[in-house]
Amino acid sequence: MAQKQKCVAMLLAGGKGSRLSALTKNLAKPAVPFGGKYRIIDFTLSNCANSGIETVGILTQYQPLELHNYIGIGNAWDLDRVSGGVTVLPPYAESSGVKWYTGTASAIYQNLNYLSQYEPEYVLILSGDHIYKMDYSKMLDYHIEKEADVSISVIEVPWDEASRFGIMNTNEEMEIVEFEEKPQFPRSNLASMGIYIFNWAILKEYLEMDARNPESSNDFGKDVLPLLLDEGKKLMAYPFEGYWKDVGTVKSLWEANMDLLRDETSLNLNDRNWRIYSVNPNEPPQYIAEKAKVEESLINEGCVIEGDVKHSVLFQGVTVEEGSMVIDSVVMPGAKIGKNVVIERAIVGSEMVIEDGTIIRPEKNVDDVVLIAEGK
């Protein structure tokens, strides 16, 4: 029997991320590079480490190899523990055959045995594909204080975007009275962040109930949470007011990277009290040539800059040759940009080679973002 844990986290990291197009052709969405040196999953794992959550199950499925290699034993996030720590949980074969995760609830249900060994009081369920910094221990304190069966972290979103999210309708005490999954006409703009805290006994009971229902899609938002409400369980909304970004599209991923370059951003990566940890790429120092010009940009290790870079994010090992300009763009690891190239409002994928004289910018709508990646 493993050492008993008060709270165990389950991190859903098996998403395909099809709206990210070629960026996720051979890569799980949580492993997509972000912010010059990170992967998207670094934010959730760092939040766990900084919040004192020492046991994290990571549920993977789509294109898991690079993500598994990146996570390793969790030492980058101080989650390599004798008891607990990080455990990668892909789908596995039973006597009846391999069971793929068919939904968010299905993924947790198939790993109830993993949770049971820790006898937790509470289970924290997380998504591995959002950019944010959050102290989960404060949410747990709130959950306990409110004597909730389930607590759901919520954030106010613009009304014109509310139909893209699971929306919570609450009373004055922030108790959830109705949950609507992507409503056409939302009555609230409190959106679910995909962060849940369940009392362990409630989670186990309702996942087993959901698994027995042949009509269920095995999804928390569509099936489990509405059932809990119908049966009178106490669901509380936990309001979050910090930076949070769903980076599920090429444009939203680009926007989140650009947010890092603002003078006053609520996503501060320089906060030594809440570090975002990542795997060290072990690259040499970046080199900026005499005639190069760099403004308002994040330039990571191993970059060689001979041209101009303005308001852009460059990952490790990027080369920008003489006469080239990179403006308002994200250039992912190992990309090579030749001479006299112009790149504007674009994401350049990992290891891409941009030939001399190429011009890359939105052709029709100046507000668009161009993606240049393998498979495009």
From Swiss-Prot:
Spell out the Pfam families in the cross-references: Hexapep_GlmU (PF24894), NTP_transferase (PF00483)
Q: Which SUPFAM superfamilies match?
A: Nucleotide-diphospho-sugar transferases, Trimeric LpxA-like enzymes
Q: Which residues bind alpha-D-glucose 1-phosphate?
A: 101, 166, 181-182, 192
Q: Name the family the entry cites.
A: Belongs to the bacterial/plant glucose-1-phosphate adenylyltransferase family.
Instruction: Report the EC code(s) recorded for this entry.
Output: 2.7.7.27
**What residue ranges are annotated as transmembrane?**
none
Reply yes or no: does the keyword Transcription apply: no
What job does the chain carry out?
Involved in the biosynthesis of ADP-glucose, a building block required for the elongation reactions to produce glycogen. Catalyzes the reaction between ATP and alpha-D-glucose 1-phosphate (G1P) to produce pyrophosphate and ADP-Glc.
Looking up PROSITE patterns in the UniProt record yields: ADP_GLC_PYROPHOSPH_1, ADP_GLC_PYROPHOSPH_2
Q: How does it assemble?
A: Homotetramer.
**Catalytic reaction(s) noted:** alpha-D-glucose 1-phosphate + ATP + H(+) = ADP-alpha-D-glucose + diphosphate
Q: Which residues form a coiled coil?
A: none
Q: Which gene encodes it?
A: glgC
Query: Keywords, A to Z?
Result: ATP-binding, Carbohydrate metabolism, Glycogen biosynthesis, Glycogen metabolism, Nucleotide-binding, Nucleotidyltransferase, Transferase
GO MF terms here are: ATP binding; glucose-1-phosphate adenylyltransferase activity
State the Gene Ontology BP annotations: glycogen biosynthetic process
Organism in which the protein naturally occurs = Bacillus cereus (strain ATCC 10987 / NRS 248)
Spell out the InterPro entries in the cross-references: ADP-Glc_PPase, ADP_Glu_pyroP_CS, GlgC_bac, GlmU/GlgC-like_hexapep, NTP_transferase_dom, Nucleotide-diphossugar_trans, Trimer_LpxA-like_sf
Report the protein name in the record: Glucose-1-phosphate adenylyltransferase
